[in-house]
Amino acid sequence: MGCAGTRIIDLRPDDEKAINEVAALLVEGFKEHSPDSWPDIESALEEVQESLGADRISRVAVDQKGTVLGWIGGLPHYAGHVWELHPLVVRPEHQRKGIGRALVADLEEHVRERGGLTLWVGTDDEDGSTTLSGVDLYPDPLEHLARIRNLRGHPYEFYQEMGFVIAGVMPDANGWGKPDIHMAKRV
């Protein structure tokens, strides 16, 4: 990782400081592109608490002082064969320094250890960041998907660089013209 001394550890249920930092990071990290995801600290804290379940993976990147720089979660589907990456967030001032990549790689390793075969992520476009947003994807969503272009730094290209492929799209997942782009990779 680009930040010296950064390490990735489990987010523990007894680490109230880290839990609160992660919740604040969720609100801050998603407010520009997906403001309804976690609009307030209460909804973010609920999401973080859910991530601490025994069947879940919840990992944080922390600096030398223990400050949370990023968070990633994973939850099992299909009897544990498929895991969902949900969510991934990195402090804005620490983005593009390898923390997100390290968190994804770490999650992949934990998914493999638990017998997972596939990791998938839904990466919403609620703000016109791709050519899939603001249009009617019916009657042929796959035709639109085949011509997808990134207009404003949508993270689907980050995931492609991490080995994910676009596996589908859910039209109108977040309201009319606001799709969820489904991406997956074998681990």
Give the label of every model feature segment.
Residues 9-86, 91, 101-106, 110-114, ...:
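Acetyl-CoA-dependent GNAT
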Residues 112-151:
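Conserved GNAT acetyl-CoA-binding A-motif
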Residues 98:
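Conserved G/P- and acidic residue-centered "switch" motifs that form tight phosphate/ATP-binding loops
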Residues 42-43, 127-128, 174-176:
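Short secondary-structure capping/turn micro-motifs that flank functional sites
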Residues 88-95, 123-127:
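A short, internal acetyl-CoA/4′-phosphopantetheine-binding micro-motif in the GNAT/acyltransferase core
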